Swiss-Prot record:
It comes from the Bacteria. NCBIfam families: trpB. The lineage of its organism: Bacteria, Pseudomonadati, Pseudomonadota, Gammaproteobacteria, Enterobacterales. PANTHER family: TRYPTOPHAN SYNTHASE, TRYPTOPHAN SYNTHASE-RELATED. Belongs to the TrpB family. GO terms for cellular component: cytoplasm. Tetramer of two alpha and two beta chains. It comes from Salmonella choleraesuis (strain SC-B67). This is Tryptophan synthase beta chain. Its cofactor is pyridoxal 5'-phosphate.
């Protein structure tokens, strides 16, 4: 089987799907390759990003949390995007591709509900029918986002099978698509899954890093020492990293969720603590039991609660171009509180993992002069009840 683009990043990636889905993936790849060369498509995408989503997003210098250190810290404000997170960028691109292929329906999966909301808003805007699979447990945990999706006309389908979380929603969405791909486009929510999705999602998120590079050069006259982003599937991180990969002076740091601590097994850090296997249509590191079953991942943040990781991150890790670390629930929560109290910004719990690592770098070497950028991938409105319940249980409020 030949593809137009390389389906692998080193040994990672590929197209491990039932034969019935190969024509749909090939059609998607063809549409993407032709759209990338089509000035009309690019102009339409750029217009939506600017006038609907609100790009470019700001690069904000932290005023207070760096006090007592020689660190300069900037936040790339994807939280200011319409929809509240970076997810909006690539769904607009995929929805335009769906229209280009003559599809009338969108199928999506969602965990925290952010990708579901983004899929629903893009579908409403472009006149596409939308159905979203969501683990029954997540439907309960994320009721405001479920209501947002329904307000925008999407059908939300709770999935009760398995653990009733994101991985089960992914399985159901793929099952649906294999029977409906002639009329439906599967709007995958992260830079993972079968080729060509990891490449498409990266290209539709790469403006994060492109804007950051131009903005930091304008503000500081040089490139940052490191860019830092949280990694679940890895779309916000690859969007930030892509334009810096060839700038070898810039450190790329991905932050996986350490949950209750790596040693407890209750985490979501397959890159550093998983084994390579086949899942969700790709070859990548994943959390597995001793007999090779997919193990439940865990994080305080539903959006990082994914048992595998995008293949390009696996490749960047394997060649040593990017460093991947983990941050626990407690560390992320502390960073969340710090940003709220000292900068007046409420970050998503996902993004708080990246911020926590930047704070750690700063505090461990206060005398080190360093220029850091954290990708603030989303806003924390969706997380305030989770945080409230934890702080209440601890007697902090």
């Amino acid at each position: 089987m030949t593809t137009l683009l390389n389906p692998y990043f080193g040994e990672f990636g590929g197209m491990y799907v039932p034969q019935i889905l190969m024509p749909a993936l090939n059609q998607l790849e063809e549409a993407f390759v032709s759209a990338q060369k089509d000035p009309e498509f690019q102009a339409q995408f750029a217009d939506l990003l600017k006038n609907y989503a609100g790009r470019p997003t700001a690069l904000t210098k932290c005023q207070n949390i760096t006090a007592g250190t020689r660190t300069t810290l900037y936040l790339k404000r994807e939280d200011l995007l319409h929809g509240g997170a970076h997810k909006t960028n690539q769904v607009l691109g995929q929805a335009l591709l769906a229209k280009r292929m003559g599809k009338s329906e969108i199928i999506a999966e969602t965990g925290a509900g952010q990708h579901g909301v983004a899929s629903a808003l893009a579908s409403a805007l472009l006149g596409l029918k939308c159905r979203i699979y969501m683990g029954a447990k997540d439907v309960e945990r994320q009721s405001p986002n479920v209501f947002r999706m329904r307000l925008m006309g999407a059908e939300v389908i709770p999935v009760h099978s398995g653990s009733a979380t994101l991985k089960d929603a992914c399985n159901e969405a793929l099952r649906d698509w294999s029977g409906s791909y002639e009329t439906a486009h599967y709007m995958l929510g992260t830079a993972a899954g079968p080729h060509p999705y990891p490449t498409i999602v990266r290209e539709f998120q790469r403006m994060i890093g492109e804007e950051t590079k131009a903005q930091i050069l304008d503000k500081e006259g040089r490139l940052p020492d490191a860019v830092i982003a949280c990694v679940g599937g890895g779309s916000n991180a690859i969007g930030m990293f892509a334009d810096f990969i060839n700038d070898t002076s810039v450190g790329l740091i991905g932050v996986e969720p350490g949950g209750h601590g790596i040693e407890t097994g209750k985490h979501g850090a397959p890159l550093k603590h998983g084994r390579v296997g086949i899942y969700f249509g790709m070859k990548a590191p994943m959390m597995q039991t001793a007999d090779g079953q997919i193990e439940e991942s865990y994080s305080i943040s539903a959006g990082l609660d994914f048992p595998s990781v995008g293949p390009q991150h696996a490749y960047l890790n394997s060649i040593g171009r990017a460093d991947y670390v983990s941050i626990t629930d407690d560390e992320a929560l502390e960073a969340f509180k710090t940003l709220c109290r000292h900068e007046g910004i409420i970050p998503a719990l996902e993004s708080s993992h990246a911020l926590a690592h930047a704070l750690k770098m700063m505090r461990e070497q206060p005398e080190k002069e360093q220029l850091l950028v954290v990708n603030l991938s989303g806003r924390g409105d969706k997380d305030i009840f989770t945080v409230h319940d934890i702080l209440k249980a601890r007697g902090e409020i």
